[in-house]
A protein has these predicted regions:
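Hydrophobic beta-strand-centered segment that forms part of the acyl-chain substrate-binding groove
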Residues: 57-106, 120-124
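HotDog/MaoC-like acyl-thioester-processing domains
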Residues: 2-24, 86-88, 98-153
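Generic structural "secondary-structure junction" signal
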Residues: 34, 40-43, 76-77, 84, ...
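Generic structural detector for well-ordered beta-strands
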Residues: 27-31, 81, 127
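Catalytic strand-loop segment that frames the active site of acyl-thioester-processing enzymes
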Residues: 2-60
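Residue-level recognition of specific faces of alpha-helices
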Residues: 46-49, 74, 109, 127
Length: 153
């Protein structure tokens, strides 16, 4: 059996991004438990940071009500590229931008920087599809959410 051809799913060349290419930032403190046996932050933690950075920003801006809002965002796609290790104890700056704004979906890109660094240690994205909280069917982005997200493009 031949190995799968990943040439269609893996970019030919991926490079770290500059801090200046992100629109908003949020500080995240690493925890002792984030490190793995190899002495750096485990890959799963990066995905948690992406989610935390975006959702905390949306909540702070008053455009996402996780407890009672009629619209919620569900993650349908995610990916991460790693360029340099991060480890406890470190403060991470998570840069956020919107790469694509659709009718009911958003592609967020998050760059993770060692505090004060100009280039990303990791860069990832995830796509939220916004759905009705009850029936889980896609709905148009609420106007206040869309207005805020446009500032991140």
């Amino acid at each position: 059996m031949n190995p799968p051809d990943l040439s269609m799913t893996t970019p030919a060349k991926t490079q770290a991004d500059a801090r200046s290419s992100y629109k908003a930032f949020r500080a995240i403190t690493t925890r002792w438990m984030d490190n793995d046996v190899y002495g750096h932050v485990n890959n799963v933690v990066y995905y948690s940071w992406f989610d935390t950075a975006v959702n905390a920003t949306l909540i702070e801006q008053g455009v996402l009500d996780i407890h009672a809002g009629s619209t919620i965002g569900l993650v349908v796609e995610t990916q991460c590229f790693y360029f340099a290790p991060l480890a406890f104890p470190q403060t991470i700056d998570a840069g956020i931008r919107v790469a694509r704004l659709g009718t009911s979906s958003v592609r967020y890109e998050v760059g993770l920087f060692a505090q004060g660094a100009d280039l990303t240690a990791a860069r990832g994205h995830f796509v939220h599809v916004y759905v009705d909280r009850i029936n889980r069917r896609p709905v148009p982005l609420p106007s206040e959410l869309k207005t805020f997200l446009e500032t991140l493009t």
